[in-house]
A protein has these predicted regions:
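Nucleotide-activated chemistry modules centered on ATP-dependent adenylation/adenylyltransferase
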Residues: 1-38, 54-216
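Short, glycine-rich nucleotide/cofactor-binding loops
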Residues: 39-48
Length: 216
């Protein structure tokens, strides 16, 4: 199919190798040498983020793990996250979203009938990761997004298109929402510009540098 063809045409441009990862890890360690943490990682309790937590410790980094509780966490999922991070000796910060606001926003997206139903969660996650990075003076955010697992998808169904578009989220909620979003984490265009170009936040898709396979 055309998505598979596009994947194989672009895979060599995106995927890197462990030798290319080494100088990045060295730079993260050097810049964070006088800080408690040298990078931020997002944890959901899923396979990808759990492996990233294991990998960054194996690489000798000192991460602060950030988890977003959007109201859908189960007790088992929370327990798994806490046990995993305790085993790896990684500190955890959990941001709990106002459930009434988030529920109203999710209902707004359902009523809008757009494909990207996870846009509100993805946006909030990225906003919280950058907020925690700013608070701790950390430049590097290491995540579990990866080309191999996520590229073969109809672009029109991908949350990546709108997950950073606060205007889209705000306008959908303005049309369909019933309560104000007073505390919902957000990344305005200014926030994006400030974190990326002034504070130089850098996202490392670390799984693109290694031979990562869920089957293994």
């Amino acid at each position: 199919c055309n998505y598979c063809t596009s994947y194989f045409e672009n895979i060599d441009k995106v995927l890197k190798n462990e030798e290319q990862l080494k100088p990045i890890i060295s730079k993260i360690k050097f810049e964070g040498r006088n800080k408690k943490y040298d990078c931020i990682i997002g944890v959901s309790g899923g396979v990808d983020s759990t492996y990233v937590a294991y990998l960054v410790k194996k690489l000798g980094l000192r991460p602060l793990a950030v988890h977003l509780d959007n109201g859908w966490d189960s007790e088992l999922a929370v327990s798994n996250i806490e046990k995993t991070l305790k085993k790896l000796d990684i500190d955890l910060y959990t941001h709990v979203i106002n459930w009434n606001e988030f529920k109203d926003l999710q209902l707004s997206f359902l009523k809008a009938s757009i494909p990207g139903m996870e846009i509100p969660s993805d946006h909030a996650i990225f906003a919280v990761l950058n907020k925690v990075a700013l608070k701790n003076g950390i430049r590097y955010i290491v995540n579990g997004s990866n080309f191999k697992m996520e590229y073969i998808m109809d672009p029109d169904w991908s949350e990546f298109i709108g997950q950073m578009d606060w205007l889209l989220i705000k306008n959908i909620h303005k049309q369909f929402g019933k309560i104000p979003l007073q505390t919902f984490p957000r990344m305005t265009r200014w926030n994006v510009y400030y974190t990326k170009f002034i504070k130089k936040h850098t996202v490392i898709n670390v799984l693109d540098y290694i031979d990562f396979s869920k089957e293994k």
